[in-house]
């Protein structure tokens, strides 16, 4: 009977060791869980960025106002009979 108890205790100890420290054990599970969490956060940021870019693309495809705004800001274009003024901060003078 004692031998059986000792064998069962050793088996239980072996299983516990494998669970906590072995391959695919608790430590690796926690590391994988943290990595998944970080990847989800990165994916959320990228999804938000993609949605903004998609909205801008749709706006450029359908609306003339977006094209005009882009031309004014990026290319500094003006309409006929319009004057463009650039205000330079004091630090850049």
UniProtKB/Swiss-Prot annotation:
Subunit record text: Part of a complex composed of FtsB, FtsL and FtsQ.
Record family assignment: Belongs to the FtsB family.
Keyword set, alphabetical order: Cell cycle, Cell division, Cell inner membrane, Cell membrane, Coiled coil, Membrane, Transmembrane, Transmembrane helix
Cytoplasmic side: 1-3
Its biological purpose: Essential cell division protein. May link together the upstream cell division proteins, which are predominantly cytoplasmic, with the downstream cell division proteins, which are predominantly periplasmic.
Lineage, opening ranks: Bacteria, Pseudomonadati, Pseudomonadota, Gammaproteobacteria, Pasteurellales
Chain coiled-coil ranges: 26-76
Domain of life of the native organism: Bacteria
GO annotation, cellular component aspect: cell division site; cell septum; plasma membrane
Species: Glaesserella parasuis serovar 5 (strain SH0165) (Haemophilus parasuis)
A single GO BP: FtsZ-dependent cytokinesis
InterPro entries documented for this protein: Cell_div_FtsB, FtsL/DivIC
Protein name per UniProt: Cell division protein FtsB
Subcellular locations according to the entry: Cell inner membrane
NCBIfam families referenced in this protein's UniProt entry, alphabetically: PRK00888.1
Topology class, membrane: Single-pass type II membrane protein
Spans within the Periplasmic topological domain: 22-93
């Amino acid at each position: 009977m004692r031998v059986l108890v000792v064998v069962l205790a050793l088996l239980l100890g072996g299983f516990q060791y494998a669970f906590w420290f072995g391959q695919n054990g608790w430590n690796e599970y926690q590391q994988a869980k943290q990595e998944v969490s970080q990847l989800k956060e990165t994916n959320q940021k990228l999804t938000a960025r993609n949605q903004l870019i998609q909205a801008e693309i749709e706006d450029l495809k359908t609306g003339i106002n977006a094209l005009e705004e882009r031309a004014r800001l990026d290319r500094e274009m003006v309409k006929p009979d319009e004057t463009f003024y650039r205000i330079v901060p004091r630090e850049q003078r």
